[in-house]
């Protein structure tokens, strides 16, 4: 990438971001800036802290559907009526095969399961899969296993695994998307994981009817929690989910590409030294503007998502190369 010079106002924001002198109101006011200015600031922050690289990760839906939780955005919730494949925990052979299929492209591989948490037997089998991947590939392993207790977190720490647990949105807005568990339960797990010394990935979803204030509050919570990686998703409303109906009826407006890019940039400015990763929904929301998100990002999730298809991996690799970034 060529050097992008900042105008005086943008330079001031950049410098205050680096020195952590921006407050909640400052982040909210960024929404009124021109998108190009936000992208310029974001790229300079990315270059300062995380250079010109785009880290790639992949996930596998290792246990799908019949989730007892009532998240209105999730096609795997039994409270929604989306038509998806449902199955129990995949075998370690199937999980290893999936990991090997993306090893050529990806640096990280995450085992994701549906449900509020995992049983002891499921956890034992997942540990076996983790060890298989670590022994037979060069991939770094992540897991998204719901609300885990201290013993399970310690077992994952012993195996140098990164934990993923999305906050999804702000504490204030969370009750609008889920009532079967609450925000504080997620915070408790993240704090316990950090206390044990686990690497932590957390983030949220844009486009569920939340305000820019909610998004900023999410970023500030992630900052306070000291997460290592921030996973950002853009809502791709799936037929059969409660949120699909809310968007169809006009109760919630779908997020557009400009709003999505601005939100990604504000995340970068609020969390300048964290790994910012864009995951699900980017193809649906950003379309041909995806490439501009790379100016603010350190990572992309590639391949398929939990119950929806992702962009062709070769297209992602070409996009990264054309924007002048390395992987």
Swiss-Prot record:
| Protein's organism | Methanococcus maripaludis (strain DSM 14266 / JCM 13030 / NBRC 101832 / S2 / LL)
Query: Subunit details for this protein?
Result: Homodimer.
User: One GO MF term, please?
Assistant: 4 iron, 4 sulfur cluster binding
Q: How is the cofactor bound?
A: Binds 1 [4Fe-4S] cluster. The cluster is coordinated with 3 cysteines and an exchangeable S-adenosyl-L-methionine. Binds 1 [2Fe-2S] cluster. The cluster is coordinated with 3 cysteines and 1 arginine.
**Catalytic activity as recorded in UniProt:** (4R,5S)-dethiobiotin + (sulfur carrier)-SH + 2 reduced [2Fe-2S]-[ferredoxin] + 2 S-adenosyl-L-methionine = (sulfur carrier)-H + biotin + 2 5'-deoxyadenosine + 2 L-methionine + 2 oxidized [2Fe-2S]-[ferredoxin]
Which prosthetic group or cofactor does it need? [4Fe-4S] cluster; [2Fe-2S] cluster
Q: What is its EC number?
A: 2.8.1.6
Enzyme superclass (EC): transferase
**Chain positions recorded as [2Fe-2S] cluster binding sites:** 110, 142, 201, 277
Q: What is this protein called?
A: Biotin synthase
Tell me which Gene3D superfamilies the record gives.
Answer: Aldolase class I (3.20.20.70)
User: Mind listing the GO biological process terms from this record?
Assistant: biotin biosynthetic process
């Amino acid at each position: 990438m060529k050097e992008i010079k900042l105008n005086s106002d943008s330079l001031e924001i950049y410098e205050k971001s680096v020195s952590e002198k921006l407050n909640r109101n400052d982040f909210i006011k960024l929404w009124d800036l021109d998108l190009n200015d936000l992208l310029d600031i974001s790229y300079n922050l990315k270059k300062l802290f995380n250079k010109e690289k785009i880290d790639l990760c992949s996930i596998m839906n290792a246990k799908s559907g019949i989730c007892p939780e009532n998240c209105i955005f999730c096609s795997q919730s039994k409270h929604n009526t989306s038509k998806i494949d449902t199955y129990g925990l995949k075998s370690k052979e199937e999980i290893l095969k999936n990991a090997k299929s993306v090893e050529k492209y990806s640096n990280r591989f995450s085992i994701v399961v549906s449900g509020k948490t995992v049983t002891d037997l499921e956890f034992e089998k997942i540990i076996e899969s983790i060890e298989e991947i670590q022994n037979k590939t060069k991939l770094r392993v992540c897991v998204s296993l719901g609300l885990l207790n201290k013993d399970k977190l310690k077992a994952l720490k012993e195996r140098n695994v990164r934990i993923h647990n999305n906050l999804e949105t702000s504490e204030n807005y969370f009750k609008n998307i889920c009532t079967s568990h609450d925000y504080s339960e997620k915070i408790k797990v993240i704090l316990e994981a950090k206390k044990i010394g686990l690497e932590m990935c957390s983030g949220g979803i844009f486009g569920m009817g939340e305000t820019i204030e909610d998004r900023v509050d999410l970023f500030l919570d992630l900052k306070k929690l000291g997460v290592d990686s921030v996973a950002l998703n853009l809502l791709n409303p799936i037929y059969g989910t409660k949120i699909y109906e809310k968007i169809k009826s006009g109760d919630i407006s779908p997020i557009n590409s400009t709003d999505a890019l601005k939100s990604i940039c504000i995340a970068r400015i609020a969390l300048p030294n964290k790994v910012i990763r864009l995951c699900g929904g980017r193809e649906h929301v950003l379309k041909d503007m995806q490439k501009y998100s790379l100016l603010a990002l350190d990572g992309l999730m590639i391949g398929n998502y939990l119950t929806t298809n992702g962009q062709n991996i070769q297209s992602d690799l070409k996009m990264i190369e054309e924007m002048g970034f390395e992987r």
